[in-house]
Amino acid sequence: MKFHSAADFVADGLRRLSVFFSPAWWRAFQPARTRISTRERLRLVIGALIGIFLTGLLCHLIGGDDLKRLPWLVAPLGASAVLVFALPASPMAQPWAVVGGNTLSALVGIVGVHGVYLLGAPELAAALAVATAIALMLTLRCLHPPGGATALMMVLGEIRDPSFALCPVLLNCILLVLA
């Protein structure tokens, strides 16, 4: 196409780009509407609320003075709660996946922290920890997406103590599954 002026060139470009600004184009990115009833939505939300609250409360009571130096909830537990309460039939929300995936990933992340010092590159250690956690979760059939976040959290938080994988990670997971 030949343009007679810069204005023609700009006008043609804007005309071609207008398709990206049309409401129909943006609607294509929206997820399909869910058919979850209001009652079911409330059950999911209240389940997650009670699950996280009880997990935090029981960990705080069980941990006692140790919790002055440790958190009693780990952040990836929020994502685990979404799976457990919103997708309870999912293989990734089953007890073995939640408990095994997060705990295994915590241990892998702790090893990854030591790798930071060997490799001298925290980015590489973080990437290796997440990739290794995924590989091991697949091998042990306990794939749980928040486990990747758990491994990453350990490396980024420079958590070196293996007991952190037991308390709070393992304890959090067991209590959430029981909630």
Please report, for each region that a protein language model flagged, where it lies by residue.
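Alpha-helical transmembrane segments and their membrane-interface boundaries
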Residues: 1-113, 117-129, 160-166, 170
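Interfacial segments of multi-pass membrane proteins
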Residues: 151-163
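Membrane-helix interface "capping/anchor" motifs
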Residues: 88-97, 136-147
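Alpha-helical membrane-embedded segments
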Residues: 167-179
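Membrane-embedded alpha-helical core segments of multi-pass
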Residues: 129-133, 144, 175
